[in-house]
Regions:
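Serine-dependent protease modules
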Residues: 1-235, 240-242, 254-258
């Protein structure tokens, strides 16, 4: 076998890993649109008003970033099959930048959470909605582990982050970072402004600990009043599902243009 043939085989293996991972996790990835008091928030470091998330329980529970849904008046979730739901906020851990949402649907496709520890140089894939370009897939490697980001205006200090060169842009926040088998290894959370190839994700152990704390608080307080669909009534509007055109076209709706 020639060197050129070996290179072609390596590229094919890489391509198959990326496409396979995207096909595995894609059905569980969601788009999140936020209305805040005073209208739609259009600009923030993290692309507030538009974000990503993923279904981690088939009864409609969704993981995303706390900053994506902070101060939300209304949260709308678009599934990969085009259905749109109003969502309730189950709980949030701002220090970890993790939030759990729930929609009134069940028997949904679920993203598998990984178990193996990450290694520097490992292939990772991000799926999300940068700038409203729905279900965008980007690939890269784990550049470093245990990174810290200093706090600043409107954001908290963050520790123990995964650094990747996977392309991350406003709107990616809250989406899954997955391994070559499509298993979630982190939640995309931030990019370095004015830089390329510097993205950061929350590691899975931090996410799992945040979910456990949210569940403990949820179990220790009285149950919220629920709508007939099962979504907690923490939002204005009805918990409805509307069938729209497929989001896979990648074309952002003009009313959702933000950064």
């Amino acid at each position: 076998m020639t060197i050129e043939e070996q290179d072609a085989q390596a590229l094919d293996a890489y391509s198959h890993a990326v496409t396979g991972a995207a096909e595995t996790v894609g059905p569980a990835v969601v788009r999140i649109d936020i209305d805040r008091e005073g209208g739609r928030f259009s600009r923030s470091l993290f692309g507030g008003g538009l974000g990503s998330g993923f279904i981690f329980a088939s009864d409609g529970q969704i993981l995303t970033n706390a900053h994506v849904v902070s101060n939300a008046r209304r949260i709308r979730v678009t599934l990969a099959d085009g259905r749109v739901f109003d969502a309730g906020l189950v709980g949030a851990e701002p220090d970890a930048d993790v939030a759990v949402l729930r929609i009134g649907a069940d028997h949904l496709p679920v993203a598998e959470l990984g178990r193996a520890p990450l290694k520097v140089g490992q292939l990772v894939i991000a799926v999300g909605n940068p700038y409203g370009l729905n279900w965008t897939v980007t690939a890269g490697v784990v550049s470093a582990l245990g990174r810290e980001l200093p706090g600043g205006p409107g954001r908290r200090e963050m520790k123990n982050l995964i650094q990747t060169d996977t392309s991350i842009n406003p709107g990616n926040s809250g989406g899954p970072l997955v391994d070559s088998l499509g298993r979630v290894v982190g939640i995309t959370t931030a990019m370095m402004p004015m830089a390329q190839g510097l993205g950061f994700s929350i590691p899975l152990e931090t996410v799992k600990a945040a979910i456990a704390r949210i569940n403990r608080r949820r179990e220790s307080r009285p149950s919220p009043r629920r709508s007939p669909s099962g979504t907690a009534r923490t939002l204005s509007g009805r918990d409805t599902a509307r069938r729209r055109g497929s989001p896979h076209s990648g074309r952002p709706r003009s009313s959702h243009r933000r950064r």
